[in-house]
Amino acid sequence: MCKRFTLIFSVVVFLLGTVISCEKQTVNPPQSEPDYDQLTENAVKEFLGFARTPRPGFHLDKAREYIKAFAQKNGWQWNRDTYGNCWFDVPATKGYEKYPNFILQGHMDMVCDAAPGEKLDFLKDVGTPHREGNLIWGEHMNLGADNGIGVGMMLAIVTSDIGHGPVRCLFTADEEVGMHGAANLDASTINSKYLVSLDGEQKGQLYRGCAGAITLQISDKFESEGAKAGLSKVTIGISGLKGGHSGRDIQDHRLSASVMTIKILDNLYEMFGARVMNINCGAVHNGIANNTEFSVAVKSSDTQAVLSQIQEIIDAFAVEYPKEKIERNLAAGEIGPEDYVCPSSGMEKILNVLKKLKYGVIEIEGNHVTKSSNISPVSLKDGEFSVKSMMRSDYNEWMLEQADYYLALGDSLKVKADVASGNPAWYSPTIYPMVAMLKEFYREALGHDIVDYRSQGGVEPAYFCQLRPDLQVTCFGPEINDAHTSKETLHIDDVPAVLKATVRTLQHVNELGE
């Protein structure tokens, strides 16, 4: 009897344990492996379609209309907030109805940069795609792969036949001009604790943090010099520099056209009393200036000596930066009666401002840049002077100190100084379960280890985490070279791994719970 009871008890315990374990076990719906080569082609197609839409920061109506039409074509409700962010929700496919909500995110705007010699209207003109092997870039100007390919991957994923739970595709506005869209996003828009931002630009890296940034603008107005007799105009044009992203590429110690402009102006003023007439240096605050054109007024008798001195300065830069291809164009001519010439007092004030600005890596810990500064653009037109300095750091306190310093500098020099924009630093010391899952899928897709990356460039998860403290978020994407320049190039062969890691995470996120 005792043995029989023991046997029955053992069977009952086993069956109960089996039932309990079955209740706890997550059963995924049947899944077929997508054709990632085809999915990649679809993502590139969607990207190039989106790239036909002009979309500089603060001018995104056409981009929103493009996404709205895409959503309505597929029967999905399109929404936008008061700032200009927009999104649509894709219902779960059959068998995935109980999966938790998931957010895919990218930004709509791009940094527009024309190729040397091109005169474009960024509100109307777009780049012409050129594809060669696994590379794609734009002719005439960049295509905006940052973050157009992220948008393209989102659109390709949700229109494919892969299984997934409910997905929100979120498209933020004005990221490149200060992350204003993310800063103005309502917390209710983040309807999931799982978010993947497809705004990365470096293969094999998974963002766990980013530097914060603050952009300062200093400006003033100067009357024109009255006496112009005996003066000639010397125009200096410099192009061909690498330029690049002022966060990602600053650690490469690339030559800035802003630095060259400041050096030449300072030298010519000290040696010849030259006065600046105009400056058009750099294009955007978050790009390393790769070109400049400016003119100075000098005594006609000094013209040849000035030209020789400029050549010597540029030659010295060429020796110091042998990897840069410096193209120069110098010309001398007459000054017209209506031409603007900055007076000596204005010239001194401009130089005092420019020489106090910082460029390049300021502090580095190991191989990681923790503090940096960029100078771009620099402008002087009809006496209106303006310069922007974008400082990045892992430490919010340092950026605030720099802001205080430059605001005080503006007061002391009697020029207008303003904080134009800023975004917070972000770091996630914990690798959350969703991020760990995606990291493993990404490692399998690439076949090598993934780097946990803290970017010197800013990314929008810094704001998303503030809206939802329990958010499990990361950012990654395919390799993009020379972002924020006309030479921007997308590596198409890096796209499949990003798609595979994203899709597999969507298909297995239910294993993490709500």
Language-model features, listed with the residues they occupy:
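C-terminal motif of bacterial Sec signal peptides marking the signal peptidase cleavage site
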Residues: G17-S21
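Acidic/His- and Gly-rich active-site-bordering loop/insert found
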Residues: V27-L135
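His/Asp/Glu-rich mid-to-C-terminal helical/loop segments that flank catalytic regions of hydrolases
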Residues: S188, R254-M271, S300-V306, E348-E363, ...
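Midchain, well-structured core segments that form catalytic/ion-binding scaffolds
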Residues: V126-G127, E132-W137, E176-V177, A182-R392
